[in-house]
Design a protein with these regions (language model features):
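Alpha-helical multi-pass membrane segments and their bilayer interfacial helix-loop junctions
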Residues: 1-176
């Protein structure tokens, strides 16, 4: 509805624009909807919108770093919703989307901006996911409610397997 309204106003008033301007406007106008409707689905769509916008700026570090402030908008909603009902299905879905988005967003923003440090960045992020889950969500009834544990555990195993090959080390200049 928000995107349609923006497009309609742009057509009626013959405003020029780009995908970037449209996406940023959609994100800024969509953020309050999350809080007004108290909707995990709206939050998930917002997070996916931020990730989509960031994907269009891969390589432009000054623009893609805006991923982090845009994503931080969802954190108060997530914390408030967690206090009300920690293990609801909607909140679990939002956690899955946010955790996946954080992994992808880290790769898009930080790994491209700091090319030699991607191994350390991802190892720290995945370890942090696993430890935060162990600290905060240890009473979860199933793995569906623990996306951080799944991403952290599986991600650490995948990263360890990737680092057994030569290409990651050659890409940072290590030739021994």
């Amino acid at each position: 509805a928000i995107g349609g309204a923006i497009a309609m106003v742009s057509q009626i008033y013959n405003l020029s624009g780009s995908y970037d301007g449209f996406a940023v406007t959609w994100l800024v106008l969509g953020a309050p909807v999350i809080y007004l409707l108290r909707s995990s689905l709206a939050g998930s769509l917002y997070v996916l919108g931020v990730l989509g916008w960031s994907c269009s700026h891969v390589g432009d570090v000054s623009q893609v770093l805006w991923y982090w402030p845009f994503t931080a908008v969802i954190v108060p909603f997530l914390l408030r919703s967690s206090r009300a009902g920690t293990f609801t299905s909607g909140l679990a879905f939002l956690r899955w989307v946010l955790t996946g988005s954080l992994v992808a967003g880290t790769g898009i923003s930080l790994a491209h901006g700091l090319p030699g440090l991607w191994m350390v960045i991802f190892a720290a992020l995945l370890s942090l996911f696993y430890l935060v889950d162990a600290l905060l969500l240890d009473e979860a009834p199933s793995l569906w409610h623990r996306p951080m544990r799944v991403f952290g555990g599986v991600g650490c195993v995948v990263l360890a397997l990737m680092l057994t090959y030569e290409w990651p080390w050659k890409s940072i200049g290590w030739s021994h």
